[in-house]
Regions:
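Canonical radical SAM enzyme core domain
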Residues: 49-52
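Asp-based, Mg2+/Mn2+-dependent phosphohydrolase catalytic module
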Residues: 1-9, 13-35, 54-73, 80-267
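Conserved phosphate-coupling serine/threonine residues in phosphotransfer and NTP-handling enzymes
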Residues: 46
Length: 267
């Protein structure tokens, strides 16, 4: 029985206009979120770290998408919980406020390239402006033996004008190429974020539906965790793209948009 609904944001619920940093809801999203929220917990779990979690609420509300407090999750928030549990106190962070704020809120000191060590690890998130000196500083820390973490290594995500580059993945790839250090990833398709949601709601993944636009991210995460997976073709992938995924990681259902989600017979 489905007892909770987990939605991706970009390409599933809404599209971001990069120039303005605002969202526009996708077809059926507003009505679906409103109707489902009256029936069960609804959580938005994005792979993005453009903003701290708290900043997403008014942006999505402006697009007509209203989520309850504590029901928007980013991989930076997942990372913060996990790294505190590891006992980390100070991180070298290549990332903007979307990564820094959750870490600070969790009690971790955030250092940036140019700051003196020691650091416990290197953490990568989305950032708009970075250069060779930032990469060099992080590489030196990794050559010194520190572990590498990333919020997401997705190559791209859906935007209002087409695909947008996954900056954190690009930075991680550059550092891995230079240092041969493989990042530990907290975002989708890793299941740790979905397990955090399961713990928060006290609902196992087997009783959740996960809806997303990327077969390699939220759909793969859902299948690995045992959740029911629904793909929508409003973002990065076509129906053929969903169908071509290997069966163990393939969406159970693929829809053209969210407008027909509530009429499905598997609820």
């Amino acid at each position: 029985m489905i007892r909770a609904a987990i939605f991706d944001i970009d390409g599933t619920l809404a599209m971001m206009h990069k120039d303005t940093g605002t969202y526009a809801a996708l077809p059926g999203a507003v009505e679906t979120v409103k109707a489902l929220s009256a029936r069960m917990p609804v959580v938005a779990y994005t792979n993005g770290t453009f903003f701290p979690p708290a900043h997403y609420y008014p942006l999505l509300a402006d697009a007509g998408l209203h989520l309850k407090p504590g029901h928007i999750l980013t991989p930076a928030a997942v990372a913060a919980r996990q790294l505190v549990a590891k006992g980390y106190k100070r991180l070298l962070v290549l990332g903007a406020d979307g990564t820094r704020v959750p870490l600070r809120d969790a009690g971790i000191e955030v250092a940036i390239p140019g700051d003196e060590g020691p650091f416990d690890a290197v953490m990568i998130g989305w950032m708009k402006d970075f250069g060779a000196k930032d990469l060099e500083h992080a590489a030196q820390a990794l050559w010194g033996g520190l572990p590498l973490y990333a919020t997401s290594v997705a190559p791209h995500f859906a935007g209002a004008k087409g695909r947008l580059l996954g900056i954190s993945g690009a930075i991680a790839a550059a550092l891995q190429n230079a240092t041969c250090v493989t990042p530990t990833v907290f975002g989708k398709p890793e299941v740790i974020g979905l397990l955090d949601i399961a713990a928060m709601l006290n609902i196992p993944p087997e009783d959740m539906v996960v809806i997303g636009d990327d077969p390699a991210l939220e759909i793969a995460m859902a299948r690995k965790a045992g959740a029911f997976a629904v793909g929508v073709t409003t973002g990065t992938a076509s129906a053929e793209g969903f169908a071509s995924a290997p069966e163990p990681l393939r969406a159970h259902v693929t829809l053209p948009d969210l407008a027909g989600l509530l009429s499905q017979g598997w609820w």
